[in-house]
């Protein structure tokens, strides 16, 4: 089992305590490995939220000894300009404003801005100018939050 999968198993119960969502986990092996955890609080992810998660998961990681040498642990929000990396993010960020870019045009458009309604039947649904737009998931080249 990969480090990210083991960390996820340990992390999910911690996040559930405060209704936080796991956005992504990155493990970068090197002389001094880096473990990056991206979390989302629907009420706004604060530094205190990141610190709380860092202390809790850090203590568990030390007990479980998943990483066999000194490592850097980073816990943060996904950031303003981060592109969606996994399908779960379409549920995590439901209700938020997004920009969706397509590979092929839909009604002569390749960029859609609106409120994310979610992913249903392999289609990304957004509310754009009071109209629901359905974009086949395989046609999506990029999705990110719109600030």
From Swiss-Prot:
GO terms, biological process: ribosomal small subunit assembly; translation
Source taxon at top rank: Bacteria
CDD domains: YlxS_C
Gene Ontology cellular-component terms listed: cytosol
UniProt-listed SUPFAM superfamilies: YhbC-like, C-terminal domain, YhbC-like, N-terminal domain
One family name in Pfam for this protein: RimP_N
UniProt xrefs under InterPro entries: Ribosome_maturation_RimP, RimP_C, RimP_C_sf, RimP_N, RimP_N_sf
Keywords per UniProt: Cytoplasm, Ribosome biogenesis
Subcellular location: Cytoplasm
Family recorded in the similarity comment: Belongs to the RimP family.
Function: Required for maturation of 30S ribosomal subunits.
The name this protein goes by in its record: Ribosome maturation factor RimP
Organism of origin: Sulfurihydrogenibium sp. (strain YO3AOP1)
């Amino acid at each position: 089992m990969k480090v990210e999968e083991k960390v996820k198993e340990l992390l999910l119960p911690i996040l559930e305590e405060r209704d936080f969502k796991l956005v992504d986990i990155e493990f970068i092996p090197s002389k001094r490995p880096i473990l990056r955890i991206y979390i989302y609080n629907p009420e706004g992810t604060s530094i205190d939220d990141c610190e709380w998660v860092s202390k809790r998961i850090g203590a568990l990681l030390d007990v479980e000894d998943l990483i066999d040498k000194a490592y850097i642990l980073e816990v943060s929000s996904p950031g303003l300009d981060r592109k969606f990396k996994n399908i779960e993010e379409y549920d995590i960020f439901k209700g938020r404003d997004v920009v969706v870019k397509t590979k092929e045009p839909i009604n002569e458009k390749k960029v859609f801005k609106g409120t994310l309604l979610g992913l249903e039947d392999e289609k990304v649904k957004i509310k754009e100018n009071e109209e629901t737009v359905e974009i086949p998931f395989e046609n999506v080249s990029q999705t990110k939050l719109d600030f």
